[in-house]
């Protein structure tokens, strides 16, 4: 091959597009991780951001450490969005894959102070009980999440739990929950607002649509690919939901 032809050929291969495919990753679709706080035992609480659109959506998992299946499901979401960055058009995804890192490490519901983080939010229906914490946001994990909500007010939230096997909601989120239930094996079911829960605080008090996505018992035995096969379409329905 003549030198000029060879040079043009390799310039083509190294160009941003080749055979119709982008060879340069979309920077907005690369997950960026930020420490937003530390747990009682000093473990980092990380938020992952993807996209740079105006609409903010929040995806949470493992606020109860004994309900761990949501974490690999969320990590699989990041992989899917990296491969399909168009799903982030107009949106910013913020996710906390492990809200309760101490509980997650120990596979226990509570944090290391013996507090149920999903009863530690300053909701109007909060109840004073030892396992709910000495006051609303007394725990570093719930404070980190509340501060994240204040810094980046989301258009909607999904919090992934186990093992009730249903799609629940608080606040103006019934239509979102129904769209998610239509896309997965879980039924739509209203469980009611729990005292001091994130659903009560964000959904009822702040008016942010929030879905509690309750996976099945035993789903933690599934790998990320299996979880994504069952629940990925519902997570994508949440992400793409439009009023």
Describe the residue ranges of each PLM region.
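His/Asp/Glu-rich mid-to-C-terminal helical/loop segments that flank catalytic regions of hydrolases
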Residues: 219-243
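Active-site/substrate-binding loop(s) of hydrolase catalytic cores
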Residues: 39-40, 54-63, 67-191, 200, ...
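Short beta-strand-to-loop junctions in surface cap/lid or active-site-entrance loops
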Residues: 46-54
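Short glycine- and acidic-rich boundary segments immediately preceding or forming the N-terminal edge
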Residues: 8-45
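Bacterial N-terminal signal peptides that target proteins for export
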Residues: 1-8
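Short beta-strand/turn micro-motifs at beta-sheet edges
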Residues: 42, 46-47, 199-201
């Amino acid at each position: 091959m003549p030198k000029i032809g060879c040079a043009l050929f390799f310039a083509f291969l190294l160009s941003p597009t080749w055979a119709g495919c982008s060879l340069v990753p979309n920077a907005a679709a690369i997950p960026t991780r930020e420490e937003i706080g530390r747990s009682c035992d000093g473990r980092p609480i990380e938020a992952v951001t993807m996209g740079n659109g105006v609409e903010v959506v929040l995806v949470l998992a493992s606020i109860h450490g004994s309900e761990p299946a949501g974490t690999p499901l969320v990590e699989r979401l990041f992989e899917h969005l990296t491969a399909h960055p168009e799903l982030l058009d107009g949106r910013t995804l913020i996710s906390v894959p492990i809200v309760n890192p101490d509980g997650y490490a120990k596979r226990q519901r509570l944090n290391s102070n013996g507090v149920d983080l999903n009863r530690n939010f300053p909701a109007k229906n909060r109840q004073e009980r030892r396992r709910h914490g000495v006051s609303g946001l007394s725990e570093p994990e719930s404070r980190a999440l509340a501060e994240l909500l204040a810094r980046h007010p989301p258009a909607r939230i999904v919090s992934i739990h186990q093992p009730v096997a249903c799609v629940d909601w608080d606040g103006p989120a019934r239509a979102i929950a129904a769209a998610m239930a239509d896309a997965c094996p879980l039924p739509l079911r209203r469980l009611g607002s729990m005292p001091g829960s994130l659903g009560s605080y964000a959904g009822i008090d702040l008016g942010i649509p929030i879905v509690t996505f309750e996976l099945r018992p035993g789903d933690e035995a599934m790998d990320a690919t299996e979880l994504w096969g069952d629940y990925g379409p519902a997570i994508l329905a949440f992400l793409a939901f439009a009023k």
